[in-house]
Amino acid sequence: ADIAVVGGAEAIIHPLPVAAFAQMKALSTRNDDPEHASRPWDADRDGFVIGEGAAIMVIETLEHAQARGAKIYGTLAGSGISADSHDIVQPDPTGSGQASAMRKALASAGLSPCDINHVNAHATSTPLGDTAEAHSVAAVLGKATDQVLVNGTKSMTGHLLGGAGALESFAAVMALLKRQVPGTINIEHLEEDLEVNVVTHTTDLPNGDLAALNNSFGFGGHNVTLAFTNANATH
């Protein structure tokens, strides 16, 4: 197809699913301070915060977009999928499955780690998940790790579950378009020995070609990474 409408939505705040996630001990218990409960990579994080919302995008071939005079926000350059099946809930601490998805996305897009400027991380604010993802991102980026701006938008939106991937993809595209990466909020004490460059305030991206990865990981070890470039990139 030349054009498609894609996205995700979630409205799950109901006693039954909330109780299920609570029983898994996946949710933050910071009930006395909910505005600051979602805190990816903070040393005192204790679980995710459920959010609700939606994001819808139109994706199409460049020729189709130009023919109808559409405003082009960015380019979906590549994608990668993996399934590590480590555990039904807990992430693989080695991050090997996550790294596989990221490497496949880079290969699909024809990009190298040194081309990446930004990673919009899955970063749910869970003790195990954030550390595992930081490890996998660093493993993929290698020597380029320190130059790549990593953020966690779930600190601001909560975890939209089925809507998270679409919303965070759009956030990554807009970061490239605006040449600014929004900071991760609610970090009071950054996790020690963190392997990636987490930004805690809005940070400018350089001029020229830009590229970003967006990670979305799920229970059971299924991992998806999308690679985006700015609209006029010549990678």
Model-inferred region functions:
Residues 1-64, 164-235:
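Conserved beta-strand-centric core segments of catalytic alpha/beta enzyme folds
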Residues 32-109, 118, 233-234:
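Condensing-enzyme catalytic core mediating Claisen C-C bond formation in acyl metabolism
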